């Protein structure tokens, strides 16, 4: 079964797409968030590429978890607390078994840290994951 981009997003990436300060999240051209006036916004971006940052055949759950973890650890190193994140996912094909386990790993950490996914992009190509938090 081949999923369209919007079917893929709806099925695997909208379960945890709202949070405090999120006016508009997953599914539109961009996200709208409210930052309290007494805070600063720290932003980081990391990309995970198959056969560079993880081996082909690595458990997709672990790939999802690690992809968010590397960003949140960068924020922690600066004394910042994660607020939300975006996900850009490049896939050779929309394999539902991979997407199911990947999204479970990703959202296990997102729920633990109470940070919503607020947007991103999906496209076809060599497997890579880019997250900004």
Go through each PLM region and give its residues:
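Ubiquitous "structural anchor" signal
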Residues: 33-35, 72, 127-128
């Amino acid at each position: 079964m081949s999923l369209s981009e919007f079917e893929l997003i709806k099925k695997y990436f909208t379960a945890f797409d709202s949070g405090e300060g999120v006016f508009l999240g997953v599914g539109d051209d961009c996200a709208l968030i409210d930052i309290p006036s007494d805070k600063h916004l720290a932003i980081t971006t990391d990309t995970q590429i198959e056969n560079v940052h993880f081996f082909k055949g690595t458990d997709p759950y672990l790939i999802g978890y690690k992809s968010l973890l590397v960003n949140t650890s960068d924020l922690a190193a600066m004394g910042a607390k994660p607020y939300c994140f975006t996900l850009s996912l490049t896939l050779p094909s929309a394999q539902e078994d991979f997407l199911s386990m990947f999204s479970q790993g990703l959202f296990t950490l997102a729920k633990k840290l109470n940070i919503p996914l607020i947007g991103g992009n999906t496209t076809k190509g060599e497997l890579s994951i880019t997250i900004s938090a």
